[in-house]
Amino acid sequence: MKLALEKFFALKAHNTNIQKEILAGITTFITMAYIIFVNPQMMAQSGMDYGAIFVGTCLAAAFACLFMGLYANWPVGLAPGMGLNAFFTYTVVGEMGYSWEIALGAVFIAGILFFIMSITPLRRWMLDSIPLNLRIAMGAGVGLFIGFIGLKNGGIIVANGATFLSLGDFTNPSTLLAGLGFLLISILSIRKIPGAIIIGILAVTLMSIFLNLIEFDGIFALPPDVTPVLMELDILGALDVTMISVIVSFLFVNLFDTAGTLFGVATRANLVEESGDIKDLDKALKVDSSSSVFGSFLGCAPVTSYVESSAGIEAGGRTGMTAVVVGILFLLATFLSPLAAVVPAYATAGALIYVAILMLSGMESLNWDDQSELLPALIMVVMIPLTFSIANGIALGFLAYVSIKVFVGEISKISSGAWFLTLIFVAKFIFL
């Protein structure tokens, strides 16, 4: 068995061993396990069955991780993506009024398009043709979107008729616990303690139990029935022309998020070859895109590679065996449904705020010297949360980019990809 594992994953060639890979897998799982609490809680607000989406989240993540490990041999964990799950629930279903079945159909279509791009030159064309500042702005804008939801769920900000928003009531135990959860996660992360986010979520949940704010129903149980969301996607409904901007948003946010994560992980895991090419990048992208398709069958928003995988790589993970361990742990997590169900929304608020802040870190790489590049990016970052729509924020960013470039005499610098997306967004605003 040991020799078979060493041969299959090429452990010696990657200067690692079974013990290191198992430890790395456990480390990665601990750092990203918060998704099994956050994702069902968020997706259930779209009308989906909580227990079913809990199991769907675990199964989608398990499939993706096992596929990544066994096919691509990358030490990367995958799960339904943060940000896109919020877009799914609050914008596509909540604001735009589509059913969650149609929204899942859009996830499926975006996944198919992503897969096609990953096996054709379209991927390189699109990655190269979208301005770097706008790619960075997408991630940062989604971060602010997540942070806004976290602040709202924690009661830290509340609606105000006179000023739109105001500070929440910190004499309310749930609001206070949400703030304490964020502080705890931040402190543990700064001290480099693995699993800081999930520790913060569970700590707030435990305090809530002691304060009799919630009822505790146990930790383990047989997995809930997944059939209420299984294969319930409405693909034909998602083919409506009004869904184009939604599909584009799912596609490109996932594409750039995945590309950024994989490029970063490849460097840390020594997967960059002497030629500068990344080893088996095409396989990793195929896994990511096909996992989104599979996840849509289980009621999930687009599945994506997690930057938290870097924690496992720091622990010594170098091969797909790390991802396989993560996948097995996600399968075992299906038995934690009672614990997941008892976690209150304010317990995950701190996690959302913390993840949001991490997503803003990419803004340091913006080109702050060229205002024709900077201003459209900042418009995108600001308008995603303020319009409460990733699709509208991205659209306004591209419209601003092309408009500014045209009128400052830099039309030749506008790439074909930027023109293509801008025309789609113009059509959206005029005809839809």
Range-by-range predicted roles:
Residues 1-52, 166-167, 198-282, 423-427:
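Helix-loop-helix hairpins and the membrane-proximal interhelical loops
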Residues 2-35, 39, 60, 80-139, ...:
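Helix-loop-helix junctions within the multi-pass membrane cores of secondary transporters/permeases
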Residues 41-52, 91-102, 241-244, 344, ...:
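Helix-coil boundary and interhelical linker segments in multi-pass alpha-helical membrane proteins
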Residues 47-66:
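Loop-to-helix transition at the N-terminal end of transmembrane alpha-helices
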Residues 64-77, 186-192, 250-257, 288-298, ...:
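Transmembrane alpha-helix interface/packing and boundary motifs in multi-pass membrane proteins
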Residues 75, 205, 209, 316:
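Conserved, well-structured core segments that form the ligand-binding/active-site neighborhood
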Residues 96-210, 214, 324-432:
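Membrane-embedded alpha-helical modules
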